[in-house]
């Protein structure tokens, strides 16, 4: 069973996150700070994600759990008052392609809609070459909304979910 829980300020959570960043396929898409380095220092993971856990006002990190075991990461952040961006990945090849990511995204969409009823739009912007992720996001209900170029010059696909009525 797939569930979500807030990422915790524990060595176990930071270590799990670091281990996923070392996985080559995942690292290709998500760890941009030291993408060309052979290692991802645990201290760097703790610094970057610790701030998000200890001061959850801008970015809200969660773990994706399969039967209570961490298998992935999902976070949301406010781009504007009514617009939320998402980042997500599953940590190892063994858990990809099984529908877990789509289920986690559906749960996160519901969580955001419950916790933040003013939100009108959710978006996610994977690299345009990350076909597996794009398939997952479409399966979860996200719809194509065009292409953008990220700050590193990479072509990304913009996918969105819009809420027609306020949640109230």
Listing of model-derived features with the role each one plays in the protein:
Residues 1-42, 168:
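A short, well-structured alpha-helix characteristic of acyl/acetyltransferase catalytic modules
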Residues 37-95, 111, 115, 163-165:
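Acetyl-CoA-dependent GNAT
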Residues 92-98, 128-129:
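Active-site acidic-Proline motif in GNAT/NAT acetyltransferases
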Residues 95, 99-108:
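Conserved acetyl-CoA pyrophosphate-binding loop and the N-cap/start of the following alpha-helix
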Residues 102, 128-146:
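Conserved active-site alpha-helix within GNAT-family acetyltransferase domains
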Residues 107, 111, 135-136:
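Structural preference for long, well-ordered alpha-helical segments within the folded cores
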Residues 122-134, 150-155:
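Conserved beta-strand-loop-alpha-helix junction that forms the acyl-donor binding cleft
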Residues 155-168:
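Terminal substrate-recognition subdomain of acyl/acetyltransferases
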